[in-house]
């Protein structure tokens, strides 16, 4: 909004000229989302506590230390969604189609998560909305997004770029739409599975969003994309502002979500944040890089898949003491804070590996 209002005055005002730069607006987005989180956080937490008498239901079969979390409110992802969307609407170019498509997906996945959290709180159990129902809704939203990208782009690309290899890409044809849907839905659920400890998912999400802030900027810049031999996609640079807002809002949320958490992001936050990262990776044609940068999410999801299939195949045996993987280490006696910080370190390593793929070709 501010960008569009100030754009006509770029040549007449130094301040207006600053808004012409994506980097300036991205930095401002971090400041705004951080500030909004600090201001609205205590108010939202108090409000959620007044509505949720028992807070988020805690699994009885989980680590014993988790019973101290009883009564902690959920749906804190509302804080992240509101601050991120507001900063994007204020600072991004509102004529940019990618901004609106991404915000649509972000909010839509957030609504699915809210429905799930609401069901858990009202029923006072950790099951929420049926898994198949959630997958169906996620599939519908991701399909709408993929169709919009297909028909709004003048020359849609069905190429899957392979990182670390020069000029290596796979033409998936119209199967690319199915693949893109898988990326978006998979990313949403992967982040959801990772969000099981205080602050565990928040920082890796911030690292991933920060990585894609850089990727969006480079892919949307003709000079940089040519230099790095990346697929140039006009107008994706504006997604840098949105990604920066995600970084700020996640760091602001961490203030209240660090152990011992005052609030959980819930599925409202995890499904929406995972979904929006998947959408941005599809738009920027860096789907595989998302799997690298967000490697922690992939590992957590893989641990669940292996556990479930092995349990069924062996009729009751388990690979891990408990899945997702972070609970396995808790069952081994690791303190929650140690699991969280070590997983943060792993996510930093994955982010650096993913970003190195932009240059190593």
Swiss-Prot record:
Similarity section: Belongs to the glycosyltransferase 4 family. MraY subfamily.
NCBIfam families per the UniProt record, alphabetical: mraY (TIGR00445)
GO biological process per UniProt: cell division; cell wall organization; peptidoglycan biosynthetic process; regulation of cell shape
Statement: the UniProt record of this protein carries the keyword Magnesium: yes
Listed name of the protein: Phospho-N-acetylmuramoyl-pentapeptide-transferase
Lineage: Bacteria, Pseudomonadati, Pseudomonadota, Alphaproteobacteria, Rickettsiales
Record's keyword annotation contains Nucleus: no
E.C. designation(s): 2.7.8.13
CDD domains per UniProt: GT_MraY
Bilayer-crossing regions: 28-48, 74-94, 99-119, 133-153, 168-188, 203-223, 236-256, 263-283, 288-308, 338-358
Pathway it works in: Cell wall biogenesis; peptidoglycan biosynthesis
Organism: Rickettsia montanensis
UniProt GO molecular function: metal ion binding; phospho-N-acetylmuramoyl-pentapeptide-transferase activity; UDP-N-acetylmuramoyl-L-alanyl-D-glutamyl-meso-2,6-diaminopimelyl-D-alanyl-D-alanine:undecaprenyl-phosphate transferase activity
